[in-house]
């Protein structure tokens, strides 16, 4: 797989899960002899929701909630066949969304 690059984007709501998954991917790639660039932390997305607590009146009574989406980017430069095989077998946490692209 010469002149290839694997770009892995991770998304999660919990920053501890995404950091743990990132560490597993980086350690697996380095163990199989590939060069790793990253992990690069991408901007965290904040989604805020405001909900009226009262069903009828009292517009001043509100609750606010937010969801934070943490993102990381990992580039694996010059991956070997062992690297691809090891990454395919890797079992990551359930709360982490993984997008893989070859470039």
Curated annotation (Swiss-Prot):
Q: Which GO biological process annotations does it have?
A: translation
Known InterPro entries for this protein?
Answer: Ribosomal_uS10, Ribosomal_uS10_CS, Ribosomal_uS10_dom, Ribosomal_uS10_dom_sf
Q: Which GO terms describe its cellular component?
A: ribonucleoprotein complex; ribosome
Q: Which UniProt keywords apply?
A: Ribonucleoprotein, Ribosomal protein
Domain of life where this protein originates: Bacteria
Annotated GO MF terms: structural constituent of ribosome; tRNA binding
Q: Which Pfam families match?
A: Ribosomal_S10
Q: How does it assemble?
A: Part of the 30S ribosomal subunit.
- Tell me which family the UniProt entry assigns to this protein: Belongs to the universal ribosomal protein uS10 family.
> Which NCBIfam families does the entry mention?
PRK00596.1, rpsJ_bact
What function does this protein fulfil? Involved in the binding of tRNA to the ribosomes.
What name goes with this protein? Small ribosomal subunit protein uS10
Q: Please report the organism this UniProt entry assigns to the protein.
A: Pseudoalteromonas translucida (strain TAC 125)
């Amino acid at each position: 797989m010469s002149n290839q690059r694997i770009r892995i984007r991770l998304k999660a709501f919990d920053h501890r899960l995404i950091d743990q998954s990132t560490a597993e991917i980086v350690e697996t790639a380095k163990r199989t002899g590939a060069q790793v660039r990253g992990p690069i932390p991408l901007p965290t997305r904040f989604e805020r929701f405001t909900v009226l607590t009262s069903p009828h009146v009292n517009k001043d009574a509100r609750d606010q909630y937010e969801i934070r989406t943490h993102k990381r980017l990992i580039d694996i430069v010059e991956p070997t066949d062992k690297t691809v095989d090891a990454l395919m077998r890797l079992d990551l946490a359930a709360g982490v969304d993984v997008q893989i692209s070859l470039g």
